[in-house]
C-alpha cells in the first residue's frame, strides 16, 4: 500500500498561513526547514538508476535544468528585469525551487506560493521558477465582485473579455480589447464601497500593457502579475508550461513515458484505486477519473487512455488521448473522434526519434499536452529540488508519488505545501460584523422553533394568566408523559402527546410568527457575510499594504 500522506486543510483565520517546511528552522524543530528538504531531495534523486532511453536520469536532469533555466530567464527578460548569472555551471548546480498555477485571477492564498518561492530560493541561495500552467482550460472570463452589506450581498459578474469556446489558456487570445482595457475601472467602481483602494487600480494598467504586447489573455495576466512582483522585490523566473514541454530534454522524458504508455496507464489506475481505498473515497471521479480503455475497432485491439490532452489548430477543444501499440515500433495516438497520428515511439526506438516525432506534431499544429499529474512529475523529477504545492496540488500529487514508485521503484523528491487565507478587511466599514453572529442567532431561532413544536407549554403565559383550555392541555400531556409506555399503550401515548402539542400551537402562534419572520433576514445575513468574507476573492481586490503583510514582505 502506498504511503499516502495526511491531507492538509486551508487555514481559517484571515491572515493565517500554512508553510511546510518553514523558510528557516525553529528552535523546536531545527531539522525542519527548506534547506533540509533540498538536501534530502537531492539524496532521493541521486538514488534513481532509471534509464531514460540511453541516458541515466541524473544526466537528463542536468541537461533539463540547463534548458529550463536558460529558457525561463529569456522568457522573463522579454517583459521584466531578471538576474541571469554569468557562471552557468554554478547556476545549474544551485537549488531550484519551483511552483505553478493557472494564469487566472486566483485568491491571495495561491499568490502566497509565489512569495514562498522567492523566500525559499533566497534561503538556499537558489533560483525560483514559477510555471504558468497555460495548458489548463480557460473556462470563463468574468470575475464575481462582492457588492452589498453584511445584511444582504451578492456577486456581480464583471467580464474582463468576451466569452468564447473553452480552450487551453495558451490558445486563448483577447477577443474584445476594449472590454479588457476597461475591466480595472469597472471592477474597482463596484468594489469601492467595500474596498476603495484595491491593488487592481495599480495593477490592471500593467495587464493592458502586456496584452498589447503578447495578445494572449492568460499570458497577459501572468506577465502583469509577475511585473508587479518585481516591484515587490521578488526575484523569480517564470515559464509557461507550453514552452517547457517543447524543450528537447522534456520531450525525451515525455517520449519515454509514451513509449511505456501501457505501464503508465496501469500504474495510474492502480494508484487511484489505492488512494480511494486508503481514503475511503467512493466516487469514481475522485480524486481524478480512471483512465479508460476502448475497443471501438476490435481488429485494432484496445486503445488505452493516457494522461495527456490533444487538440489541433482547427479544433482547439482539449480532448482525451488514447494510445494503441498493436503495430510494432509504432505508437498510434487518437482522440477517438477525428484526430489520429502514428509516431515512431516505443521502448526500442531511440530518444532522438521520440523528440523528432513530438517536434513534428508541434510543426503540424497538433498540441499534445500533459495533464496536471504528468506536468508536476516532469517538474519534480527533472528540474526542481523542491516543488511548492498548494493544498489541492499536494493532495493530487500523492498519486504522482505512487505512480513514480510503480514506474521506477524509487521514492520521488518530497514537495513543500504553502497556502493561506486572506479575507477582505471589511470590519472597519461594518463594525456590526464583530458585534453580531448571525449563524449563532439563526441556530437559536431554529432551536426555539423546534422547542415550540415539541414543548409548546414552555412558551405559554404564566400559569395564572393561562386560559383554562391551555391548562387542561398541559395537564393531559403531563399525564400521558407520566404513563408507562406499555406495548398496548405506547402508540396511543405518542399520539396523545402529539395531539396536545398541536392544540397548544394555537396559544404560541404569535411567538412562532415572530421567529419565522427572523429566519429570512438572518439567513440572508449569514449568506452575505460568508460571501463578503470568502477566501476566494481575487488577490487584486485587496489593498496593497494588506497583501504585502500577508505575503511575508512586511512585518506587522
Regions found by a protein language model. Give the residues of each.
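Short hydrophobic beta-strand that contains or immediately precedes a catalytic carboxylate
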Residues: 387-389
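N-terminal regions that are enriched for targeting/export leaders
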Residues: 2-103, 175-183
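Internal, well-ordered alpha/beta segment that forms a basic, Gly-enriched binding/recognition surface
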Residues: 130-223, 227
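N-terminal catalytic cores of NTP/NDP-binding nucleotidyl/phosphoryl-transfer enzymes
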Residues: 92-124
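Short, conserved secondary-structure transition motifs
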Residues: 135-139, 245-252, 420-432
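Aromatic-residue-lined binding/catalytic grooves and analogous aromatic/hydrophobic interfacial grooves
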Residues: 190-355, 359-364, 370-371, 375-378, ...
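Short active-site loop/helix that positions an aromatic residue
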Residues: 394-405
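Glycine-rich phosphate/pyrophosphate-binding loops
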Residues: 121-142, 408-419
Amino acid at each position: 500500500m502506498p504511503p499516502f500522506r495526511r491531507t492538509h486543510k486551508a487555514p481559517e483565520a484571515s491572515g493565517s498561513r500554512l508553510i511546510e517546511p518553514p523558510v528557516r528552522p525553529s528552535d523546536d524543530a531545527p531539522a525542519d526547514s527548506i534547506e533540509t528538504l533540498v538536501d534530502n531531495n537531492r539524496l532521493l534523486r541521486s538514488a534513481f538508476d532509471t534509464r531514460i532511453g540511453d541516458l541515466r536520469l541524473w544526466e537528463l536532469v542536468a541537461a533539463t535544468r540547463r534548458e529550463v533555466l536558460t529558457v525561463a530567464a529569456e522568457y522573463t527578460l522579454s517583459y521584466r528585469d531578471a538576474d541571469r548569472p554569468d557562471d552557468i555551471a554554478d547556476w545549474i548546480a544551485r537549488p531550484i525551487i519551483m511552483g505553478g498555477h493557472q494564469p487566472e485571477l486566483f485568491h491571495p492564498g495561491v499568490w502566497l506560493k509565489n512569495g514562498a518561492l522567492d523566500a525559499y530560493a533566497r534561503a538556499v541561495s537558489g533560483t525560483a521558477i514559477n510555471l504558468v500552467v497555460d495548458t489548463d482550460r480557460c473556462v470563463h472570463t468574468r470575475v464575481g465582485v462582492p457588492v452589498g452589506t453584511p445584511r444582504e450581498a451578492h456577486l456581480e459578474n464583471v467580464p474582463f473579455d468576451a466569452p468564447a469556446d473553452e480552450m487551453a489558456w495558451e490558445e486563448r487570445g483577447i477577443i474584445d480589447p476594449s472590454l479588457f482595457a476597461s475591466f480595472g475601472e469597472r471592477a474597482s467602481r463596484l468594489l469601492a464601497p467595500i474596498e476603495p483602494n484595491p491593488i487592481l487600480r495599480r495593477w490592471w494598467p500593467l495587464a493592458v500593457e502586456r496584452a498589447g504586447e503578447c495578445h494572449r489573455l492568460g499570458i497577459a495576466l501572468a506577465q502583469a502579475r509577475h511585473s508587479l512582483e518585481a516591484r515587490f522585490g521578488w526575484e523569480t523566473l517564470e515559464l509557461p508550461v507550453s514552452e517547457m514541454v517543447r524543450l528537447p530534454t522534456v520531450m525525451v522524458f515525455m517520449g519515454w513515458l509514451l513509449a511505456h504508455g501501457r505501464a503508465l496507464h496501469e500504474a495510474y489506475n492502480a494508484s487511484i484505486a489505492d488512494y480511494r481505498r486508503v481514503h475511503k473515497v467512493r466516487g469514481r471521479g475522485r480524486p481524478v477519473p480512471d483512465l479508460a480503455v476502448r475497443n471501438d475497432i476490435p481488429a485494432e485491439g484496445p486503445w488505452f487512455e493516457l494522461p495527456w490532452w490533444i487538440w489541433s489548430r482547427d479544433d482547439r477543444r482539449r480532448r482525451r488521448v488514447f494510445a494503441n501499440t498493436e503495430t510494432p515500433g509504432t505508437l498510434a495516438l487518437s482522440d477517438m473522434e477525428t484526430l489520429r497520428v502514428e509516431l515512431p515511439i516505443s521502448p526500442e526506438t531511440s530518444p532522438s526519434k521520440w523528440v523528432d516525432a513530438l517536434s513534428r506534431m508541434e510543426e503540424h499544429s497538433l498540441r499534445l499536452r500533459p495533464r496536471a499529474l504528468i506536468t508536476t512529475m516532469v517538474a519534480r523529477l527533472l528540474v526542481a529540488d523542491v516543488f511548492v504545492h498548494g493544498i489541492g496540488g499536494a493532495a493530487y500529487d500523492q498519486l504522482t508519488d505512487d505512480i513514480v514508485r510503480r514506474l521506477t521503484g524509487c521514492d520521488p523528491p518530497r514537495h513543500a505545501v504553502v497556502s493561506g487565507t486572506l479575507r477582505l478587511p471589511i470590519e472597519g466599514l461594518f463594525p456590526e460584523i464583530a458585534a453580531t453572529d448571525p449563524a449563532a442567532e439563526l441556530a437559536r431561532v431554529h432551536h426555539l422553533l423546534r422547542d415550540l413544536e415539541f414543548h409548546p407549554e414552555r412558551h405559554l403565559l404564566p400559569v395564572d394568566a393561562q386560559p383554562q383550555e391551555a391548562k387542561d392541555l398541559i395537564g393531559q400531556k403531563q399525564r400521558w408523559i407520566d404513563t408507562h409506555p406499555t406495548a398496548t399503550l405506547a402508540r396511543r401515548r405518542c399520539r396523545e402527546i402529539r395531539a396536545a402539542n398541536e392544540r397548544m400551537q394555537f396559544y404560541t402562534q404569535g411567538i412562532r410568527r415572530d421567529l419565522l419572520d427572523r429566519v429570512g433576514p438572518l439567513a440572508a445575513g449569514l449568506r452575505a457575510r460568508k460571501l463578503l468574507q470568502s477566501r476566494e476573492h481575487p488577490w487584486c481586490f485587496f489593498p496593497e499594504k494588506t497583501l504585502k503583510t500577508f505575503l511575508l514582505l512586511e512585518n506587522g
